[in-house]
Swiss-Prot record:
CC per GO annotation: cytosol; intermediate filament
Tissue-specificity statement: Detected in the upper portion of the hair cortex.
Statement: the UniProt record of this protein carries the keyword Repeat: yes
Entry protein name: Keratin-associated protein 19-1
26 X 2 AA repeats of G-[YCGS] as annotated region, ranges: 5-84
Assembly description: Interacts with hair keratins.
Record keywords: Keratin, Repeat
Domain of life: Eukaryota
Designated gene of the protein: KRTAP19-1
Family statement: Belongs to the KRTAP type 19 family.
InterPro entries on file: KRTAP_type8/19/20/21/22, KRTAP_type_19
């Protein structure tokens, strides 16, 4: 099980890889995107990622990460704490 996590600009939730796949890229604030996955949306860009592989897609008020579409790598459920996003397996 590998783990990839980081936060950007104080607000931004990260996604951790699971199932031995080791995929999952940190989501950025605003419209920031990292390697075509974890694209931001909804102002703060909580863990959104739509596309052929669907890395770390986000939804809901705080955009808890949930992989779906294609292979759906990099699911996570980060905690919201003082405006910072910390990654964690869920």
């Amino acid at each position: 099980m590998s783990h990839y996590g980081s936060y950007y600009g104080g607000l931004g939730y990260s996604c951790g890889g699971f199932g031995g796949l080791g995929y999952g890229y940190g989501c950025g604030c605003g419209s920031f995107c990292r390697r075509g996955s974890g694209c931001g949306y909804g102002g703060y860009g909580y863990g959104s990622g739509f596309g052929s592989y669907g890395y770390g897609s986000g939804f809901g008020g705080y955009g808890y990460g949930s992989g779906f579409g294609g292979y759906g790598y990099g699911c996570c459920r980060p905690s919201y704490n003082g405006g910072y996003g910390f990654s964690g397996f869920y």
